[in-house]
């Protein structure tokens, strides 16, 4: 650390630590109306999953009521939630997508 004298005082530079931004999980929530194939398309299109992984996540959503699509910084997570909900509404599906702090 650098020190310098000024008017009889010793000034010492303080090292600041930057923390990584908080991360958020993007979750899909199960419903009784959205087709499983549509959920797979969403996971492939917006979360860059291959078909096998998308199928596993879709089955988790179906069986457990929710599934994690990915973990992202807040702005990216928020954008993905908006994109998924908008895409689902355009195709007249009630698919719910939310984010929560990791």
UniProtKB/Swiss-Prot annotation:
Pfam family, one: ClpS
Membrane-traversing stretches: none
Domain of life: Bacteria
A GO biological process held by the record: proteolysis
UniProt-listed InterPro entries: ClpS, ClpS_core, Ribosomal_bL12_C/ClpS-like
Signal sequence, start to end: none
Subunit structure of this chain's protein: Binds to the N-terminal domain of the chaperone ClpA.
Family indicated by similarity: Belongs to the ClpS family.
Function field: Involved in the modulation of the specificity of the ClpAP-mediated ATP-dependent protein degradation.
NCBIfam families hit by this protein: PRK00033.1-5
Record protein name field: ATP-dependent Clp protease adapter protein ClpS
């Amino acid at each position: 650390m650098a020190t310098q004298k000024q008017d009889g005082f010793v000034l010492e530079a303080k090292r600041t630590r930057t923390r990584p931004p908080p991360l958020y999980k993007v979750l899909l929530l199960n419903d009784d109306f959205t087709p499983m194939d549509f959920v797979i398309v969403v996971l492939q299109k917006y979360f860059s999953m291959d078909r096998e992984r998308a199928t596993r996540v879709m089955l988790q959503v179906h069986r457990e009521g929710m599934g994690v699509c990915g973990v992202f910084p807040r702005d990216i997570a928020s954008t993905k939630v908006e994109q998924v909900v908008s895409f689902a509404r355009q195709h007249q599906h009630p698919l719910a997508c939310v984010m929560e702090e990791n």
